[in-house]
């Protein structure tokens, strides 16, 4: 049995980029790597069946299966996945799943970690998950900025040494499907244009304050905020905190402590975590 942990990743703003080569596709954008994420256990078993269990057994395993079969088309495996954060709320759980499973599978089959990231990126992208979370996770810095779309070395991720520290994540509504949002042509164009402007502005003056400010301008111009998200951001800002929407979810990230965030926006699901540079990797082998 092999176990791996992968950090989650919040995208703050993004510019979707398409390409015939999935390794060069994804998005430009800025994000935050999280101390909470996904823990995966992979156990090779006789035969060719794949049995997966995600959290309480109700989670989707489509991207996990894509990763496994990209590496071993016919082997038998038992796979257990545990999420620290909700799925479909912009916390990068599908990407973290893909990376953690790919690292385990590549360890089992003697492949490199670089190959694991490439496989995870393609599976997450084609499976309708994140558009750049895997590249952000691969960067090993608190606040990765994806200046060129795709997975390195095709894409490029830079570290501008922005210290994020501790953040609170709060969920305000039902999950969103990234693929559903981006499938609307008009919405896609709005997001792409807003993302291009956001990237240009952020690269001129990267800082924690501008990360929140530009994230809010992006979500407003792209038209992706729900009423609940909009109200929560406004309420926290009125109390002197910074807050912005997680892409793409009915959720926010803020510098307000959990207790103070809840006192402002209500008794919602919320958790505090750190922005971290530590890489994803194997945590146990047997």
What are these regions (language model features)?
Residues 4-6, 22-23, 31-34, 127-129, ...:
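Solvent-exposed alpha-helices and their adjacent loops that cap or buttress functional pockets
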Residues 154-286:
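C-terminal nucleotide
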Residues 91-115:
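DPxDG-like acidic metal-binding loop motif
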Residues 10-16, 38-43, 133-138, 142-145, ...:
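Short beta-strand scaffold segments in enzyme catalytic cores
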Residues 74-84, 118-125, 228-239:
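Short, hydrophobic/aliphatic alpha-helical segments
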């Amino acid at each position: 049995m092999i176990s791996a942990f992968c950090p989650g990743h919040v995208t703050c703003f993004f510019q979707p980029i398409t390409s015939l080569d999935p390794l060069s596709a994804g998005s430009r954008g800025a994000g935050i790597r999280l101390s909470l994420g996904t823990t995966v256990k992979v156990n090779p078993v006789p035969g060719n069946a794949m049995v997966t269990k995600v959290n309480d057994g109700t989670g989707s395993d489509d991207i996990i299966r894509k990763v496994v079969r990209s590496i071993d088309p016919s082997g038998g495996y038992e796979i257990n996945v545990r999420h620290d954060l909700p799925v479909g709320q912009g916390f990068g759980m599908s990407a973290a799943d893909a990376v953690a499973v790919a690292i385990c599978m590549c360890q089992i089959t003697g492949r490199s970690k670089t190959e694991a990231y490439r496989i995870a990126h393609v599976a997450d992208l084609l499976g309708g998950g994140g558009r750049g979370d895997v590249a952000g996770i691969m960067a090993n810095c608190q606040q990765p900025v994806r200046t060129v779309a795709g997975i390195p070395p095709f894409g490029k991720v830079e570290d501008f040494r922005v210290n994020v520290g501790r953040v609170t994540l709060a969920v305000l509504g039902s999950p969103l499907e990234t693929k559903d949002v981006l499938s609307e042509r008009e919405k896609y164009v709005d997001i792409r244009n807003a993302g291009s402007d956001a990237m240009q502005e952020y690269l001129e003056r990267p800082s924690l304050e501008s990360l929140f400010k530009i994230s809010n301008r992006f979500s407003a111009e792209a038209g992706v905020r729900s009423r609940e998200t909009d109200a929560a951001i406004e309420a926290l800002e009125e109390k002197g905190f910074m807050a912005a929407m997680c892409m793409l979810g009915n959720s926010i990230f803020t510098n307000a402590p959990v207790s103070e965030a809840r006192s402002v926006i209500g008794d919602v699901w919320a958790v505090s975590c750190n922005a971290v540079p530590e890489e994803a990797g194997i945590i146990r082998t047997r």
